[in-house]
Amino acid sequence: MNVYDIIKKPVVTEKTELLRKEYNKYTFEVHPKANKIEIKKAVEAIFNVKVEDVATINKKPITKRHGMRLYKTQAKKKAIVKLAKENTITYSKEV
């Protein structure tokens, strides 16, 4: 997998902004089959920073109803990446 295929987009919410400011942790939506080692290498290659720790969260698809029709939401995987103290990532909130 290419490093740009692993990291899909940053997740920007109030909770992730709190993690970023207080603990220097950044949250990304990643490819569902990516592991922690691949995520670490991808973040280090794309943003040129040193990664200390990676935690992943798998979100299973949820069955929803729209009228009589049932459908499933898409499964997602998020990675919370902790950077070294001297490193930061700047990204646009429009991404």
UniProtKB/Swiss-Prot annotation:
GO annotation (BP), single: translation
One Pfam family cited in the UniProt record for this chain: Ribosomal_L23
InterPro entries linked to this entry: Nucleotide-bd_a/b_plait_sf, Ribosomal_uL23-like, Ribosomal_uL23/eL15/eS24_sf
Gene3D superfamilies registered for this protein in UniProt: 3.30.70.330
One MF term in the entry's GO annotations: rRNA binding
Keywords from the UniProt entry: Ribonucleoprotein, Ribosomal protein, RNA-binding, rRNA-binding
Keyword Ribonucleoprotein attributed: yes
GO-annotated cellular components: cytosolic large ribosomal subunit
The keyword rRNA-binding belongs to this UniProt entry's keyword annotation: yes
Subunit structure: Part of the 50S ribosomal subunit. Contacts protein L29, and trigger factor when it is bound to the ribosome.
HAMAP family: Ribosomal_uL23_B
UniProt record similarity statement: Belongs to the universal ribosomal protein uL23 family.
Functional note: One of the early assembly proteins it binds 23S rRNA. One of the proteins that surrounds the polypeptide exit tunnel on the outside of the ribosome. Forms the main docking site for trigger factor binding to the ribosome.
Protein name per its UniProtKB record: Large ribosomal subunit protein uL23
Organism expressing this protein natively: Fusobacterium nucleatum subsp. nucleatum (strain ATCC 25586 / DSM 15643 / BCRC 10681 / CIP 101130 / JCM 8532 / KCTC 2640 / LMG 13131 / VPI 4355)
Gene: rplW
